[in-house]
Amino acid sequence: MIASKFGIGQQVRHKLLGYLGVVIDIDPEYSMEQPKADEIAANTDLRFAPWYHVVMEDEEGQPVHTYLAEAQLDGEAQEAHPEQPSLDELAESIRHQLQAPRLRN
């Protein structure tokens, strides 16, 4: 079993670019059809480590879905981000839904 470093709803930062993001899903290993060289950075070990679906914001504040290796991410220690409140709200909403899922008929 592969253990992931980050959880769904957790805020993370891209190590190189510094962008804030929220984890929305986790794959135990790279799961796209055919990996591009820049996505796995010529390191085959990355392919067999956890990969994360992360929502980040572009320069205009629009949500962007990214697919990143665990090695590309750091945990985010800061709770509030006044410059990106929508990502704080998304993280809180996801965590709330995981704690109290809605029952469906």
Curated annotation (Swiss-Prot):
<dbReference type="InterPro" id="IPR011722">
    <property type="entry name" value="Hemimethylated_DNA-bd_dom"/>
</dbReference>
<dbReference type="GO" id="GO:0005737">
    <property type="term" value="C:cytoplasm"/>
</dbReference>
<keyword id="KW-0963">Cytoplasm</keyword>
<dbReference type="Pfam" id="PF08755">
    <property type="entry name" value="YccV-like"/>
</dbReference>
<keyword id="KW-0346">Stress response</keyword>
<comment type="function">
    <text>Involved in the degradation of certain denaturated proteins, including DnaA, during heat shock stress.</text>
</comment>
<comment type="similarity">
    <text>Belongs to the HspQ family.</text>
</comment>
<dbReference type="InterPro" id="IPR022866">
    <property type="entry name" value="HspQ"/>
</dbReference>
<feature type="region of interest" description="Disordered">
    <location>
        <begin position="75"/>
        <end position="105"/>
    </location>
</feature>
<dbReference type="GO" id="GO:0003677">
    <property type="term" value="F:DNA binding"/>
</dbReference>
<dbReference type="GO" id="GO:0009408">
    <property type="term" value="P:response to heat"/>
</dbReference>
<protein>
    <recommendedName>
        <fullName>Heat shock protein HspQ</fullName>
    </recommendedName>
</protein>
<dbReference type="InterPro" id="IPR036623">
    <property type="entry name" value="Hemimethylated_DNA-bd_sf"/>
</dbReference>
